[in-house]
Regions:
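Short, low-complexity disordered leader/linker segments with a strong preference
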Residues: 1-56, 368-370
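Short, polar/charged alpha-helical segment
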Residues: 26-30, 44-55, 65-86, 168
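Extracytoplasmic ligand-binding site segments that recognize negatively charged/polar headgroups
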Residues: 61-76, 88-104, 110-247
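Periplasmic-binding protein-like
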Residues: 164, 192-201, 222-226, 231-233, 237, 304-328, ...
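A bilobed periplasmic-binding-protein/Venus flytrap-type ligand-binding module shared by bacterial periplasmic
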Residues: 169-174, 210-212, 282-297, 305, ...
């Protein structure tokens, strides 16, 4: 008899528990909707309704910060998933292009774009021209299948679809094994002084150390690095090519994905170093444009890029780029088990301040043209 009662109680719990959980989830969504509405934000509570509205919209126009092959691959994958949508994408990754589009918006020029690439340091300037859709809450409530940390918790509507891992490059034929740096302090050794080291005048890579080391430490380090009398450069691809050709031996603070791309293309003398704490920054930030005619389709596309399929496309095609916040992504795997200096949203918003202070610590250098 006791066994029968226990079974009946267990069955009763199993039937009631899902209802209670659903009620709890529903209450959470209702509360999120109230909070969003109080801030003037829209929050869709049903993914099926988003899809139904996207079917009526039928298309999507986006200015994306990815390379063209990636854009094509994402477009094809998105169309396969949602065959009723006809997307039109254009490459928009150049900072000058982003600034020019912002000036057009500020001048009152009308736009038919639904999604735009936004520079991290330009988020405040773009804020007035973004659609007030609470993507963060929709991700937290499971309406959109997006890792919530990919979305800015302050603006609620800007998403970082990728992360950049800052690394070090060297030519293995030119740099002896015993001089290969193992720590950040190793770059300050006499062996690397006197124009034996490339350093970018734009200090975004060294700024990536601030979250782990603190701004004061990084400013001091920047002054010591400048005292090494490096070759000051601007940009990476041209100098990585020169390094692969045997012109330089060591590049401080370049991009992991940039070095790996070149190795894939045959630059086998190049090697990449991941030094802890590893600077990782949120990049490929995008938002839905204010007044977008196809906001529901825009939400579905951002969700698609944030998905495992979209992240794999970026790693394979971009290549070597994905979000550290995407579980199981290659970037998350690369960072796993290492001490990370994570430039999260709080630090991303302070990036302009870091850049200004570190440029001063460098001594306001200029690129040394040949």
């Amino acid at each position: 008899m006791k066994i029968l009662v226990a079974i009946l109680l267990a069955l009763a719990y199993c039937s009631v528990a899902p209802v209670a959980q659903a009620g709890s989830a529903g209450a959470g969504l209702m509360q999120a909707q109230k909070e969003a509405e109080a801030k003037g934000f829209r929050l869709e509570g049903n993914r099926e309704e988003i899809i139904a509205k996207a079917k009526k919209e039928g298309g999507l126009r986006a200015l994306l910060g990815f390379d063209k092959p990636t854009i094509v691959a994402l477009r094809d994958g998105f169309r396969k998933k949602y065959p009723f949508i006809n997307p039109h994408f254009e490459e928009h990754g150049n900072p000058a292009e982003s600034q020019r589009y912002l000036l057009e918006l500020q001048a009152g020029r009308t736009s038919d774009w639904d999604i735009v690439n936004v520079l991290n340091e330009g988020q405040y300037e773009y804020a007035s021209y973004t659609e007030k859709i609470d993507l963060r809450a929709m991700a937290e409530q499971g309406v959109l299948q997006i890792p919530p940390k990919m979305i800015n918790p302050e603006s609620r509507n800007v998403i970082a679809l990728s992360s950049t891992v800052d690394a070090v490059a060297y030519n293995k034929k030119l740099l002896p094994p015993d001089l290969v740096p193992k720590t950040w302090d190793d770059f300050l050794k006499p062996a690397h002084s006197g124009r034996k080291l490339l350093v970018d005048i734009r200090p975004n890579s060294i700024a990536g150390l601030v979250p782990a080391m603190g701004l004061e430490w990084v400013e001091s380090y920047a002054r010591k690095l400048a005292a090494q009398q490096p070759v000051w450069v601007r940009g990476h691809t041209r100098y990585l090519n020169a390094m692969a050709a045997g012109e330089y031996r060591l590049f401080f603070g370049t991009y992991y994905h940039g070095v790996m791309r070149m190795k894939n293309r045959g630059a086998q003398d190049l090697e990449v170093l991941i030094i802890e704490p590893v600077p990782v920054r949120l990049t490929e930030t995008h938002t839905i444009v204010k007044g977008a005619r196809r906001p529901n389709t825009a939400m579905l596309f951002l969700e698609y890029v944030a998905s495992a399929e979209g992240q794999k496309i970026m790693w394979d095609v971009e290549p070597f780029k994905s979000s550290i916040y995407s579980p199981g992504s290659k970037t998350e795997e690369l960072a796993r088990g290492k001490k990370i200096s994570l430039g999260d949203w709080e630090h991303a918003m302070k990036q302009p301040v870091y850049m200004e202070k570190l440029t001063a610590a460098f001594g306001f250098p200029r690129e040394e043209k040949k």
